[in-house]
Amino acid sequence: MNIFDELKERGLVFQTTDEDALRKALEEGSVSYYTGYDPTADSLHLGHLVAILTSRRLQLAGHKPYALVGGATGLIGDPSFKDVERSLQTKKTVVSWGNKIRGQLSNFLEFETGDNKAVLVNNYDWFSNISFIDFLRDVGKYFTVNYMMSKESVKKRIETGISYTEFAYQIMQGYDFYELNKNYNVTLQIGGSDQWGNMTAGTELIRRKSNGVSHVMTVPLITDSTGKKFGKSEGNAVWLDADKTSPYEMYQFWLNVMDADAVRFLKIFTFLSLKEIEDIRIQFEEAPHQRLAQKTLAREVVTLVHGEKAYKEAVNITEQLFAGNIKGLSVKELKQGLRGVPNYHVQTEDNLNIIDLLVTSGVVNSKRQAREDVSNGAIYINGDRIQDLEYTISENDKLENEITVIRRGKKKYFVLNFK
């Protein structure tokens, strides 16, 4: 199976400019292609992973990737299917975010070895050297306002208002493709389906300005089986940066994917062969309660993003927390596993009697409730049940002299911080 047909089989081809021509190009030799990443945050997230992994699949098939960091376009903001205009960031912020994105991309693409090693480019390099007058004369003249207004991404903003800054974004992205086509013989652009209008602006500019060959392929914006936009946990983005979304949190995210989505996501987010995925599907449908598809997803993606050590750590945290074995984990692991639970910073003057502390730290609302919970065996300190109403937190309860973990009932965790 050629690479284009495999991408289709995996559900990774949403739209192309000319499917037959693109398939033929990918079959006949090495194609140089690019994907753009605007630094709109200090990390990429799961939503970016579809295009990143598609880029990696093409590289493994012998094609040459160019990763474009939008140092210039990141200063403008893409209006595509956004309800309101993005906040403009400072140059310093965009440069900082761009550097972090470079580091993350190197985890997925091969930049060091091989004839088709990836190349990193920044569109600030060419936009900073072109004057506004030259841009209007040499680029703007190829775009009619009617053409620009016809883009769905613009149409949706006309009623609420769109600034000229954002309106011009599609020309800038189109010029990126032209620059890469002219200087690096890049003939394919890959991006999310919401980018179609901006991407075809590039093929139009290449056709009109140089009569060059160019293709566009979009990957789908992933939604779950309920139609909900994929890549968020509790309304928050799942980031590729371990400091923003820990490996444990990412592991839990994949572990909790719905049955109806699990096999489809294996095709999109892992490098398991289609035959391996089909075998998993059969086993999964025979025993869905064992959650083989979700466990495989969690293993493959966390290992891919954070490495095998982080994956094993996430599994261990999951198992120990499920068993209530707090002392089986390091403070570092506990902070991963309990990120997001209520925290209380203990002051030196605080009364460390269990009843007073439960109220002060917000575990319970009243001393009466605290006494009731302790008497009934509902309170655990570092995994040990406490039923002594006079119990006082001691140095022995401070894990690594830093935290104490309180559990109320089976699942409600609270962390006391002593630093």
UniProtKB/Swiss-Prot annotation:
GO terms for biological process: tyrosyl-tRNA aminoacylation. ATP binds at residue 232. Residues 352-419 form the S4 RNA-binding domain. A motif ('HIGH' region) lies at residues 39-48. InterPro entries: aa-tRNA-synth_I_CS, aa-tRNA-synth_Ic, Rossmann-like_a/b/a_fold, S4_RNA-bd, S4_RNA-bd_sf, SYY-like_C, Tyr-tRNA-ligase, Tyr-tRNA-ligase_bac-type. Homodimer. Belongs to the class-I aminoacyl-tRNA synthetase family. TyrS type 1 subfamily. This is Tyrosine--tRNA ligase. It comes from Streptococcus agalactiae serotype V (strain ATCC BAA-611 / 2603 V/R). The gene is tyrS.
